[in-house]
A protein has these predicted regions:
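N-terminal Lys/Arg-rich, disordered targeting/topogenic segments
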Residues: 1-7
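Glycosyltransferase catalytic domains, chiefly GT-A lineage
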Residues: 8-630
């Protein structure tokens, strides 16, 4: 009996020793795992931590919690399994997630289930409101970026089908889409109609039938963006225009006829922008110029209440970027005039490399954004946790040192985020491969809807590259600064009687050229002053100024209404001669200066005067006359 008792005590002692050994071994292993995990998280010294309400923050905390819980489960073995605070399935999933051994479908399902678990009422529509509280506005922007990149990781770039992933989940894929993209028409699994815009051929007046799809409408709608992209075909021009833009678009069609354009146009509308009379005028001009023009009415794919409340002015451009049916397109403002064919843009090496080509605005160093805007945008960057869990990376971010001289894109990033310069991109013409850049376009739209960010930029311009940046995409920016075309004037002679060698052009147009000094396109039309009734308004505003220079209203009106006479182009060096805004054309006129150096400057950002051959001038001014013809 005594021997048996001693034997039991010895066994118990050995068991306790074994358990203690296992305990300390686990602690050492767990510590090493935590150090490794910490090193992975902190590979960027200044990388931010996810906000408290982030799904990735919750998952990381859950991993730490389950590691401790696993130890208790091991120690209690079979005796106290009810102490565990998580299911065996979740523990396995979290361990696989930490070791990057998990299937993407399981990872994505878990991420979005956590999103709903943290906040059952989450909705990206919240970002469209301006709360004027940095903590609230910045947190919502941070969550927006994280959610959109997660959606892209799983369903756009990741090519998973949400209707399949969430087939046996607490997450409803239709509800997920409704909350992720609040501008889309609200759908559910009972939807009987495929989401598709109403498209009308404006030359025939006939409706273009929606394509036949090889799936149930609820499945198509529940994975709308992937299916929409899959059915996008061909190339074309895309516009969004209001009533006031119709006369400009009619001129644009005539220029396209002169240039022998063969690509179709799609005017993308939320449904109420154009009157019956304007539609009739466009149809008539399209027939006369033999241009194919289609009206894309998006009222069938947009949420009416959201669109009426939040989509206006510049936001309409994002509807056009997303809901045209082209695979590749050139987005145009109605007052843009191209001087090269569409193939030039689509064949551009920088466009082919990145899938989106942007052009630089005038360099206006004295106009700036705000530091609080930069602080907000830094919160949109991927957190350390997001980087670890789904591998999000940006071309540029605030945690990494870089040189602004490495590329035009780096220079723009540096000047916006470090120097706070406001104007960088002229979005009058943007070349886009929608199949490649859809996630960045969606990011752009949602950023431009953000109630706070709207106060940080002018319209949609900078959002084109910011959206691609925060979606983790690359993008291309033409390296030549926005410039000016028009009649070339020479500064008066110096006091010693010698020519000044300084030339200037004053006009309302922004011109864009390439590194070979070729004129590509102009924003602002080709009328000397495009602003209606500007002569009368100018005289009424500053009668002494305009009377001393032009005599009377009728003379100024004749000048304003004339075709722009193009003699040359100036790309100014603003560090020497900044842009000068003058009072003409309702303050829309600018002057730029350069020396007549005979194209000797090799640096693209140096100020220079560009003159054209007789053949080039004839072609340019023929287009100007075509634009201004009645």
């Amino acid at each position: 009996m005594l021997k048996s008792l001693k034997s039991r005590r010895l066994i118990l002692k050995r068991l306790v020793t074994l358990l203690l050994s296992l305990f300390f071994s686990y602690l050492i292993f767990s510590a090493s795992r935590n150090v490794t995990s910490s090193n992975k998280l902190n590979n960027h010294a200044s990388e931010r931590t996810a906000v408290e309400s982030s799904a990735f923050n919750w998952i990381e905390k859950r991993q730490h919690q389950v590691r401790s819980e696993n130890l208790m489960n091991r120690l209690s073995a079979y005796f106290l399994p009810f102490l565990s605070r998580s299911s065996h399935k979740e523990r396995v999933l979290l361990r696989q997630l930490g070791n990057n051994e998990i299937a993407k479908s399981d990872k994505c399902r878990y991420i979005f289930e956590v999103l709903y678990k943290i906040d059952p009422d989450w909705d990206n529509a919240q970002t469209a409101k301006f709360y004027n509280v940095d903590g609230v506005d910045n947190t919502l922007a941070s969550l927006l970026g994280e959610r959109l990149r997660s959606y892209d990781y799983c369903f756009l770039s990741g090519q998973l089908d949400p209707t399949a992933i969430f087939a046996n989940s607490t997450v409803n894929p239709h509800d997920l889409q409704n909350r992720m993209f609040p501008f889309l028409k609200k759908i559910n699994e009972e939807s009987k109609t495929v989401m598709w815009p109403i498209i009308t051929d404006m030359t025939t007046g006939e409706a273009v039938p929606a394509p036949e799809v090889d799936m149930e409408s609820s499945n198509f709608n529940g994975n709308f963006w992937s299916n929409w992209n899959r059915l996008s075909k061909g190339r074309g021009f895309v516009l969004t225009i209001a009533e006031k833009d119709v006369p400009l678009f009619l001129k644009q069609l005539k220029v396209m006829e002169f240039s022998k354009n063969e690509l179709p146009f799609q005017i993308v509308s939320t449904g109420n922008e154009l009157s019956t009379e304007s539609i009739a005028k466009i149809s008539e001009t399209a027939k006369e110029t033999e241009q194919r023009v289609y009206l894309v009415d998006c009222s069938t794919v947009l949420d009416t209440n959201f669109a009426n409340t939040y989509i206006s002015f510049f936001q309409n451009k994002w509807v056009a970027t997303l809901f045209n049916t082209f695979e590749e397109y050139i987005l145009l403002d109605a007052d843009v005039v191209p001087f090269v064919g569409s193939d030039y843009f689509f064949d551009s090496p920088s466009y082919r490399e990145s899938g989106i080509l942007l052009f630089k605005d005038r360099v206006m160093e004295n106009e700036q954004t705000f530091q609080y805007c930069i602080e907000m945008l830094n919160e949109v960057e991927p957190s350390a946790q997001e980087r670890r869990f789904i591998g999000s990376r940006l071309v540029f971010d605030s945690s990494l040192p870089f040189s602004s001289e490495t590329s035009e894109e780096a220079s723009v990033y540096y000047n916006f985020f470090k120097k706070l310069r406001l104007h960088h991109v002229d979005s009058g013409l943007v070349v886009v491969n929608k199949l490649e850049k859809l996630n960045g376009l969606l990011m752009s739209f949602m950023l431009n809807l953000d109630g706070k960010l709207q106060r940080c930029v002018y319209g949609d311009k900078e959002i084109f590259w910011l959206g691609q940046l925060y979606a983790g995409q690359d993008y291309s920016i033409n390296p030549v600064d926005g410039s000016i075309i028009g009649p070339v004037n020479e500064e008066p002679e110096n006091d010693d009687g010698h020519k000044s060698g300084m030339y200037y052009i004053c006009s309302t147009q922004i011109a864009h050229s390439d590194s070979k000094n070729r004129l590509l396109w102009v924003n602002g039309g080709l009328k000397t002053c495009k602003i209606s009734n500007s002569a009368e308004d100018d005289f009424g505003r500053e009668p002494e100024y305009f009377k001393s220079r032009y005599g009377d209203i009728s003379k100024l009106k004749r000048i304003y209404d004339a075709s722009l006479n193009v003699e040359g182009l100036i790309v100014p060096d603003v560090s020497v001669h900044p842009w000068m805004q003058i009072k003409e054309c309702s303050n829309y006129m600018y002057c730029a200066y350069a020396t007549g150096d005979g194209h000797t400057n090799s640096e693209l950002d140096e100020g220079r005067l560009i003159t054209f051959t007789e053949k080039e001038l004839r072609y340019i001014n023929d287009i100007s006359r075509t634009w201004n013809a009645n």
